[in-house]
């Protein structure tokens, strides 16, 4: 068997039609937010480890560089440094927080511990004009998060703004700019204006990163890479794999064979919807495999969430290998991997400073003896970008607006061993949650809402009889890109209806709890 060969060409959707910037990640908790704000301005960007070599980036032809914040102090011996190519490139540079201090330190300024640390809201006052602050008032609110500060500017730099505790809240020398505050967070209300000023006025970028331009470029790159070979696609029916299927089918037609594997781990009615949309509506040569018993046997006795993910990923690939042998040859395996999947898995392409959170079965959970090359045309996209592309490709709204669903399915919404009984419980509870949230008209404002079966029993009283039954947790969150999420403040009467229906309509459940934890510290899924 050949080794796993990740996709290359179509992972980086770049061409002269896309202006781009590079974000060097120094470990900031806000690094992904910088990328989101840049994409919101319709400029393509990639977030890469701070020590990435220029040779790995020059294909992007970036028009600017952003240095993220980070937890280190620039004067420490082992602190992350500025790659020499950044200044040698002659490109505009925007340093944020640690990035600003790194610019100052590298170019001859002085950075020292602040006498008074700044964490939280602050007001900065402009003291000089610069394109980065075009259209901003003399004083504006920002978000600070730093324990060091610049005590002396590097030669040739001028101070642009100051705050009560930071005499150099912003600095610049021509196209080299530093901001001590964080323009990427919502607590800096005018931060998007500042970032757009950098992108458009300083870097000279054009807002050409759109769904239309991406689709045009992706189709061209898929055709170039695939040639006359055939592609096998893992179709789950979720937004990601559905958009990947529609995009690849638009590019190469029936060279694509979408495979839907009914693992028995899907939501109620999901298998029927997939067959209807892709088999009959899009007229794709859909191959449907009933593997429910196969996956249940593989998961028997397994409770560890990482082991579940790996076993499911391995079994998926074995199914695809069997299809490839019977209907092949296929050279490529296509997946709907997104940028947050890559970042959370700390897979190749994600920041080296990011700790591994969990294995996504379509990233780190794949066996290393995979017999295909991976084709992942959405690998550098966020969820909202994928939805926009799905609409452009003509996917029905019921697919485009479908809430995210984990690759391992309900297996990671059952804490503990996956059994037929547990699946029946969580599937029915999840259906009730979806029905009630949608009936309340709240689904469009939520990122995800679902039920989780907990590995505990609870004492209760039902029909004058003592019960000792299972517990369901309800999870509902708001988010824009899954990188951060807040628990949803659902109305109490809705929560009451959910609890009442679940304990009365789902056999084996006598208690319902509501998860009020945000991300971070928790992840959206429980496993």
Curated annotation (Swiss-Prot):
Pathway: Purine metabolism; GMP biosynthesis; GMP from XMP (L-Gln route): step 1/1. ATP binds at residues 236-242. Keywords: ATP-binding, Glutamine amidotransferase, GMP biosynthesis, Ligase, Nucleotide-binding, Purine biosynthesis. GO terms for cellular component: cytosol. Residues 209-402 form the GMPS ATP-PPase domain. Its EC number is 6.3.5.2. The keyword ATP-binding applies. It is an enzyme of class 6 (ligase). PROSITE patterns: GATASE_TYPE_1 (PS51273), GMPS_ATP_PPASE (PS51553). GO terms for molecular function: ATP binding; GMP synthase activity. It catalyses: XMP + L-glutamine + ATP + H2O = GMP + L-glutamate + AMP + diphosphate + 2 H(+). This is GMP synthase [glutamine-hydrolyzing]. It comes from Thermomicrobium roseum (strain ATCC 27502 / DSM 5159 / P-2). The gene is guaA.
């Amino acid at each position: 068997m050949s080794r796993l060969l990740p996709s290359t060409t179509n992972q980086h959707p770049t061409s002269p039609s896309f202006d781009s910037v590079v974000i060097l990640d120094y470990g900031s908790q806000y690094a992904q937010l910088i990328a989101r704000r840049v994409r919101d301005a319709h400029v393509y960007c990639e977030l890469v480890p701070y020590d990435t070599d220029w040779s790995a980036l020059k294909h992007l032809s970036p028009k600017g560089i952003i240095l993220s914040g980070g937890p280190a102090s620039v004067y420490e011996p082992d602190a992350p440094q500025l790659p020499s190519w950044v200044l040698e490139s002659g490109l505009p540079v925007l340093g944020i927080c640690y990035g600003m201090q790194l610019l100052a330190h590298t170019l001859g300024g002085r950075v020292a511990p602040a006498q008074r640390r700044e964490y939280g809201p602050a007001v900065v006052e402009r003291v000089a004009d610069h394109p980065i602050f075009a259209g901003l008032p003399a004083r504006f609110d920002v978000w600070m998060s730093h324990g060091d500060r610049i005590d002396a500017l590097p030669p040739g730099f001028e101070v642009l703004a100051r705050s009560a505790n930071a005499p150099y809240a912003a600095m610049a020398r021509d196209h080299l700019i530093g901001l001590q505050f964080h323009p990427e967070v919502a607590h800096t209300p005018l931060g998007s204006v500042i970032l757009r000023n950098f992108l458009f006025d300083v870097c000279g970028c054009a807002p050409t990163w759109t769904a239309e331009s991406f689709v045009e470029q992706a189709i061209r790159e898929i055709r170039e890479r695939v040639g006359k070979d055939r592609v096998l696609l893992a179709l789950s029916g979720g937004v990601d794999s559905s958009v990947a299927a529609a995009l690849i089918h638009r590019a190469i037609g029936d060279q694509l064979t979408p495979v839907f594997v009914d693992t028995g781990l899907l939501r109620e009615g999901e298998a029927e919807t997939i067959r209807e949309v892709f088999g009959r509506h899009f007229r794709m040569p859909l191959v449907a495999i009933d593997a429910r018993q196969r996956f249940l046997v593989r998961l028997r006795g397994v409770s560890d969430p990482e082991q579940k993910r790996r076993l499911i990923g391995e079994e998926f690939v074995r199914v695809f290998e069997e299809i490839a042998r019977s209907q092949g040859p296929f050279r490529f395996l296509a997946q709907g991997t997104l940028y947050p999947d890559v970042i959370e898995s700390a897979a190749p392409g994600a920041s080296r400073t990011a700790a591994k959170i969990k294995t996504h079965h379509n990233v780190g959970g794949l066996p290393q003896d995979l017999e295909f090359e991976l084709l992942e045309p959405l690998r550098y996209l966020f969820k909202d970008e994928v939805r926009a592309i799905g609409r452009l490709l003509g996917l029905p709204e019921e697919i485009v607006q479908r809430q995210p669903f984990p690759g391992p399915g309900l297996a990671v919404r059952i804490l503990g061993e996956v059994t037929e009984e547990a699946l029946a419980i969580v599937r029915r509870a999840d259906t009730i949650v979806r029905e009630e949230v949608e009936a309340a008209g709240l689904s469009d404002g939520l990122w995800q809402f679902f039920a989780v079966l907990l590995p505990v029993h609870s004492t209760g009283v039902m029909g004058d009889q003592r019960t000792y039954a299972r517990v369901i947790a309800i999870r509902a969150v708001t988010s824009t890109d899954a990188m951060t999420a807040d628990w949803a403040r659902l109305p109490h009467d809705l929560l009451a209806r959910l609890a009442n229906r679940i304990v009365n309509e789902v056999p084996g459940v006598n208690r319902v709890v509501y998860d009020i934890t945000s991300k971070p510290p928790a992840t959206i899924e429980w496993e």
